Amino acid sequence: YHLGYVLGPRINAGGRMGESYLSFNLLSSPNIHIAAQYSSVINGKNQERQKIQTSIINTINSGVDDNQNLINFFYDPTWHIGVLGIIAGRLMRSNKRPSFVMTDSENFIVGSGRSLGGLNIGTLMMEAADKGIIIKGGGHTKACGFTLEKKSWEPFKLFLLDKFIDSTIIQENFYELLLDLTLINNNLLNDLDLLSPFGQNNPEPIFKSENVKIEIVNVFKDKHMKCKLSDQLGNSVIGMMFDSNVESFKSYISLKNEFDCYYKVKRDTYSSQVIVHIEDIH
């Protein structure tokens, strides 16, 4: 199993859904049968988390009608606190602008933010706390969490807008190398393996291919897409897009015939075929 994308979300699910003891008991149990029981419960919690997350994202997407906002703020007192960070990250990636997602916790507003970079939003949260705008907050360059009184919502919003107004937050897509599709093969993947493990201080390389035709081959769970990327010479590679707005993507690729495509090179878990995970297209 893939530790980051398969096991990780399940181990985290207990804590996200407010029952962190489940994951602790799973990992510390000396009895494989008891561990299996906890594993089953945790998997159910992860499915519950996914349903809540999908519902909130669909609600937000159906209500967003102004993509010119400098920053996106989303708030609903009924949203589950455990999924705010995931949702903020996905909205940031899809909208290409900082996104802050908030809900109520007792008498306060709590939230999570994700940013493209440019400004350190973790530092901004600490500055806001020092100025008394929020009760507490912190994080790092691209992610933050915060708590504030409801009466401080407008001052907090104005504080962030003022900070971002002169900042370049809509960044150009960064990539390591311009590639022909013919170079996406086992040799490239073997070379990339030498650079691993990837993480915060060693990010996985992103590549770019120009003048690529994109065809949707299949859609999974209404949000994941299998695509065929083809160049002008007929060379092709399979590309995957995850957690995407399928209808918006279909509409976008109908606007023109060729795109610049940004992606990571991967090996398919099931077929062992070399594929790409699409990060963005223009």
Pin down the residues of each PLM region:
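OB-fold single-stranded nucleic acid-binding module
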Residues: 144, 152-155, 186, 247-249, ...
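Structural detector for short beta-strands of small beta-barrel domains
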Residues: 201-223, 260-262
